[in-house]
């Protein structure tokens, strides 16, 4: 019995780590596709959301054959919340994250997005839901200092990061904070895979208004582009989320969140080694501060969260 429990726990740990690694690599692969293969970011977000949404809904039906994937549509209030979550949560966080990568790089975009828990702390304090603690103050200070060093390399006179990437990265973090807080009752009632699957598909349909998925020139695609697209759209999005959620069957939510901190580490390492993104000395200090902050925040009890 003990050996069986240990084996299941190990399975959960592996699933959580693999899911986080896929997320981190997915961002770096997206960076590669934008900069070296001229993939349009608008089309990519559309394809990523539509394909991943359909994939997750199919997975849900396979796992729950007796349940309807349309159950959320039977309650008008829940449907309204799903639509809000799909547009203000899923669509904004996915587009802003990819836009930050496109105008900067995957490492900085991922780090800026992962500051989201600090925005949640500030929001809860402003609303009076929680009192400001010493931990919260230290987290805010570490965020400001780490972000300042990452973006300026310690200089008060200039940015070493594209301002557009900074804007989109901060927006991605704010959207992720909303994405984390808002859908709790949806998740409790219908489950993560169904809600995220529909949110991706609905936001993907909305993105088609900006850039239809069929408006793409594939004549210059080679096998490498196709393989990277499959990884970025399926592996780095749908499979990453599925593995992460599946790990919750075997380990606690706190442990899963802790192992999820591998994501920004992988993004930074992959960007440095594969795409040769160079970081200056004080930027490296800022990266270390933000990673320590992410680790500490993962150990602190947070609202039930989803990921990008």
What feature does the model see in each segment?
Residues 55, 116-141, 265-285:
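C-terminal transmembrane-helix exit sites in multi-pass transporters
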Residues 2-5, 49, 153, 225-227, ...:
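C-terminal-most transmembrane helix of multi-pass membrane proteins
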Residues 56, 60, 132-153, 207, ...:
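Hydrophobic transmembrane alpha-helices of multi-pass small-molecule transport proteins
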């Amino acid at each position: 019995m003990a050996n069986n429990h240990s084996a299941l726990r190990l399975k959960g740990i592996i699933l959580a780590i693999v899911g986080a690694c896929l997320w981190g690599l997915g961002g770096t692969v997206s960076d590669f596709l934008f900069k070296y293969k001229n993939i349009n970011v608008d089309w990519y977000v559309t394809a990523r959301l539509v394909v991943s949404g359909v994939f997750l809904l199919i997975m849900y039906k396979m796992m729950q054959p007796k349940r309807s994937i349309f159950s959320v549509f039977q309650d008008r209030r829940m449907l309204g919340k799903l639509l809000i979550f799909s547009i203000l949560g899923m669509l904004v966080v996915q587009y802003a994250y990819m836009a930050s990568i496109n105008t900067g790089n995957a490492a900085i975009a991922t780090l800026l997005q992962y500051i989201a828990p600090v925005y949640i702390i500030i929001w809860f304090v402003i609303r009076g839901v929680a009192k400001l603690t010493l931990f919260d103050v230290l987290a805010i200070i570490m965020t400001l200092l780490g972000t300042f060093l990452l973006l300026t390399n310690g200089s008060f006179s200039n940015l070493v990061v594209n301002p557009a990437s900074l804007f989109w990265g901060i927006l991605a973090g704010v959207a992720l904070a909303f994405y984390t807080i808002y859908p709790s009752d949806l998740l409790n009632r219908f489950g993560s895979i169904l809600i995220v699957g529909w949110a991706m598909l609905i936001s993907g349909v909305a993105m088609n208004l900006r850039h239809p998925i069929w408006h793409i020139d594939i004549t210059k695609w080679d096998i490498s582009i196709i393989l990277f697209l499959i990884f970025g759209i399926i592996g780095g999005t749908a499979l990453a989320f599925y593995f992460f959620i599946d790990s919750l069957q075997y380990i606690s939510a706190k442990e899963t969140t802790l192992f999820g901190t591998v994501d920004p580490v992988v993004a930074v390492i992959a960007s440095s080694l594969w795409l040769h993104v160079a970081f200056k000395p004080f930027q490296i200090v800022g990266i270390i501060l933000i990673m320590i902050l992410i680790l500490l925040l993962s150990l602190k009890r947070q609202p039930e969260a989803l990921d990008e």
